[in-house]
Amino acid sequence: MNIMNAKKDFKFKTHTCKIDVLGIEKEITYNNVIWISPNKLWILYANDDGIIQVEKFNDVYCDYPLMYDNGDVVYDGYLNIPKYVKENIKRILNKHF
C-alpha cells in the first residue's frame, strides 16, 4: 500500500531513538512516522518509497499492512503483532484510504 494513494494528508512526524545492534548502541531516525504505540514498542511509518510499514522497535523485521476494498487489513509477514496495534493500524488506514 503506497502512501501516495491516501485520501487525506497524513500528519507525519520524525522520531529518533537509540537501538542496540549486536551490543553496539546506534541512533536511528524514522521519517514519515504516522503512529507510535503508547508503550513505544511499535511504529507505523512510510518508507522512502512511500510504502507503509509496521515495525517493532529494536527488531530487524517489519511487516506491510495491506488493506482490502472492504476495509479489512491483513499482513504479509510473520510478525506477532498485538491486537491493539492491529486495531490502531486498521483505524488509521480506514480513515485515510
Where are these regions (language model features)?
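General helical secondary-structure elements
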Residues: I3, P82, K86-E87
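Negatively charged, low-complexity tracts enriched in Asp/Glu with abundant Ser/Thr
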Residues: N2-K26
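Charge-rich, solvent-exposed alpha-helical interaction surfaces
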Residues: N88-I92
